[in-house]
């Protein structure tokens, strides 16, 4: 039988079943009935003269033929989605730019980074979404986002088709309400309970490692992703809290808050992550080519 032609709808349904791990999951994603999906898969199997899946418990696992077909199908549909993305953003009267922001990052710094994407006289429709680095990376790989601003880079050798550009980094400071602890920094961190960024963030993990390296026996009262909320909660409980040193410009204006120490070797990092297909996107180019050195300059006491 000649295989010079193939029904790409059948291949598309197979691709979804493989990714979802079940017919039911693919049916829900495609808003179709499981019976419809099953019929399409059978038609493709007849065309290819072989089984694409085998049963494993209640789910499915691909056969050797299924693995082979998926590798090609994944490249095909990923490439077609990239084509549609590029065509769509070129045709939009307002340039659509979907950005995911890691929820642990400083909103002030992120807003300044995103400001580079906006140019007077060039229409743009910016849409921002907050989530964890892992969730945003998954959405980026599914073409649901154009770029991610995150606190950690990606390894391009491990994440095929994705690129990471370092935007900048800044040190962190420890703050508390007056009066400050009596002991010098960093020993004073043992005098009061601490509020730190969540340990699922890169900065949170760095701080925990730093406490250990300093031999500090600290008590963690809470973990917060939002610096403003951390500051407010810290004031209520007389706790020491952490914020980027750049926030000093604001905190110095608050006479009730005092900076008790800085850690210059524990940095909060900022990285722009995007797919290869977005390299020519004007907003991506502007963000990646902007000089942010002034933005990340440390505050002066």
Curated annotation (Swiss-Prot):
It holds the Pfam family HTH_1. Belongs to the LysR transcriptional regulatory family. Signal peptide: none annotated. Residues 23-42 bind DNA. CDD domains: PBP2_NhaR (cd08429). Residues 6-63 form the HTH lysR-type domain. One of its GO terms (molecular function) is DNA binding. It comes from the Bacteria. Disulfide bonds: none annotated. GO terms for biological process: positive regulation of DNA-templated transcription initiation; regulation of DNA-templated transcription initiation. Plays a role in the positive regulation of NhaA. GO terms for cellular component: cytoplasm. InterPro entries: LysR_subst-bd, Tscrpt_reg_HTH_LysR, WH-like_DNA-bd_sf, WH_DNA-bd_sf. It is found in: Cytoplasm. This is Transcriptional activator protein NhaR. It comes from Escherichia coli (strain K12). Keywords: Activator, Cytoplasm, DNA-binding, Transcription, Transcription regulation. Coiled coil: none annotated.
